[in-house]
């Protein structure tokens, strides 16, 4: 049986009653919206009975999602991880040779915000706070993500201009938001996006006949790869974490 392990004990939290969707989000299970869906589908139990939407629970209650027991983690955790190339984010990929969960050994279950495809590398943020994950991934918030990109042929001024103005992606039937882009070499550029469409940069480049040969995410909001080597991770500093929560419009509790 999988268990969300307690990072530190806090008697006051055991006594405090909170709505069950918030309880699940606080402990890194999912966002509140996803929690409401799980509750509506009868997949959450409290002390052996099916939980109801809007009911309140505390640390003494036995809360399960399916067969997985949820225990309260008093401390909010955010990790910065340097994902190497060849590593898959999604645990649902049956063909994945190596998962990020194989590389991160941490005492609390954490979930990533904004995946990178297998052939991409760079910064992933992971947390046990479902509300933070949801806030970081919400496209309407316009959070910045910065990338270094290498393509297969020489970059032109026309390419940069069109990429920066927004690109219609036929497969997704959407036009990307205008973005900041800067040439850094004959075949390389840096780009700052404020949305996270599936394989967005690769699709944008392909629209103009370019193929991406290397893609690295170097920044998410105020967090960078500084000090990290491929495959390594670290906890955010208190200052970094406080700013991240503030920029997401959340209060860390």
Could you tell me what each predicted segment is?
Residues 5-6:
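Basic polycationic patches enriched in arginine
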Residues 9, 14-253:
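Basic, flexible Lys/Arg- and Gly-enriched helix-loop patches that mediate nucleic-acid binding at interfaces
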């Amino acid at each position: 049986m999988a268990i969300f392990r307690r990072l530190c004990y806090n008697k006051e939290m055991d006594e405090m009653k909170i709505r069950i969707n918030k309880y699940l989000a606080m402990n890194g299970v999912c966002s509140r919206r996803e929690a409401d869906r799980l509750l509506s589908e009868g997949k959450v139990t409290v002390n052996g009975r099916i939980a109801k939407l809007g009911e309140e629970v505390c640390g003494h209650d036995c809360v399960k999602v399916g067969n997985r027991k949820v225990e309260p983690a008093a401390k909010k955790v955010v990790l910065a991880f340097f994902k190497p190339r060849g590593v898959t984010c999604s645990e649902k990929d049956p063909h994945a040779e190596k998962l990020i969960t194989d590389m991160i050994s941490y005492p609390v279950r954490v979930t990533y915000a904004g995946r990178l495809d297998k052939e991409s590398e760079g910064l992933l943020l992971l947390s046990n706070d479902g509300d933070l994950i949801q806030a970081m991934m919400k496209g309407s918030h316009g959070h910045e993500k910065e990338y270094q990109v290498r393509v297969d042929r020489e970059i032109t001024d026309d390419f940069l201009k069109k990429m920066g103005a927004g690109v219609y992606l036929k497969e997704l039937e959407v036009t990307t938001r205008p973005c900041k882009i800067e040439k850094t070499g004959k075949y390389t550029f840096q780009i700052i996006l404020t949305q996270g469409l599936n394989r967005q940069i690769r699709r944008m480049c392909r629209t103009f006949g370019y193929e991406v040969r290397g893609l690295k995410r170097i920044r998410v909001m105020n967090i960078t790869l500084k000090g990290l080597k491929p495959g390594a991770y670290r906890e955010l500093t208190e200052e970094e974490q406080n700013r991240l929560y503030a920029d997401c419009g959340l209060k860390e509790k």
